[in-house]
Swiss-Prot record:
GO terms for cellular component: cytosol. It catalyses: (2R)-3-phosphoglycerate + ATP = (2R)-3-phospho-glyceroyl phosphate + ADP. Monomer. Keywords: ATP-binding, Cytoplasm, Glycolysis, Kinase, Nucleotide-binding, Transferase. GO terms for molecular function: ADP binding; ATP binding; phosphoglycerate kinase activity. The gene is pgk. ATP binds at K197, E314, G340, G341, D342, T343. This is Phosphoglycerate kinase. It is an enzyme of class 2 (transferase). SUPFAM superfamilies: Phosphoglycerate kinase. Substrate binds at D21, L22, N23, R36, H59, L60, G61, R62, R113, R146. It is found in: Cytoplasm.
Amino acid sequence: MTVLKMTDLDLQGKRVLIREDLNVPVKDGVVASDARILAALPTIKLALEKGAAVMVCSHLGRPTEGEFSAENSLKPVADYLSKALGRDVPLVADYLDGVAVQAGELVLFENVRFNKGEKKNADELAQKYAALCDVFVMDAFGTAHRAEGSTHGVAKFAKVAAAGPLLAAELDALGKALKAPAKPMAAIVAGSKVSTKLDVLNSLSSVCDQLIVGGGIANTFLAAAGHPVGKSLYEPDLVDTAKAIAAKVSVPLPVDVVVAKEFAESAEATVKAIADVAADDMILDIGPQTAANFAELLKSSKTILWNGPVGVFEFDQFGNGTKVLAKAIADSAAFSIAGGGDTLAAIDKYGVSKEISYISTGGGAFLEFVEGKVLPAVAILEERAKA
């Protein structure tokens, strides 16, 4: 992937507009989870160190486009940045017709989704964004799969359009895992439905050596292999699809599972051999023997891609499978990449973030990249680099 990189540019005295993903949860006017802001900070600091006049933009939530809403304001993010950087970070609401920023200064623009035409990627709005800067930096991998005014349109019209360090690192890590992975490669794909991850499963089946499935997805594969799944969540209409995938790649199946009679925090967990699953059982995790088997497979892998917990880990009695695999990935010498919202929550819960080679900040963008789809915001940066 050939894109201009912000790290290679001379930014001294330049007006630099950086698109970050600062779409963080806010509770009572305070940032509730700062992971995305922390991921963006090095880029912002680097632009300031390079002597740029720095303008940062992002979306937050899903406001009605073109209308201000206090609950979707980036004010809590501006407050957080001021504290984190030890300097005043003004939140600018009216910026489309120009804003005064000096070299070494930093401002945060109000939610881009308050601007009409943002989601439709309107040229008129994109040209206004582009006119604000000498250099546009796309650093928000989490929104790279969306062609919007502040992610794609502005890159079309800006004098210079480059990838920020965070975006560049995501693309490098994903390329390393998917374009020419060190072998053997194992992928863990879990979730409630095969239908939502079908493209991911198909794409990975052609690059990985072991495809470990979990959650409702695993139940569909178990049913395809003729095993009882009781009243577990599965998709009978996709049994043939599961068979076709299993014919292309090794899909190791659970030999034991953790079941319950109901889906609840107070539900009693019972370990059963797969053949003993009763008609009124719900499979909510992989069993200890299966977890040990899968951990052994991961130990011998050189590349690991992890998307999704293998059980209902939010309830501790159904979290052991995910915990064992998380620890196995952490202990492995393989290049490991993890992505997707629930996966990040599991990484947090089991404290393995430092041992995973790369944790992707993008949910939908991560999955679309794995599916082999073109990410519009990356494609436009490549086009501009060629020109």
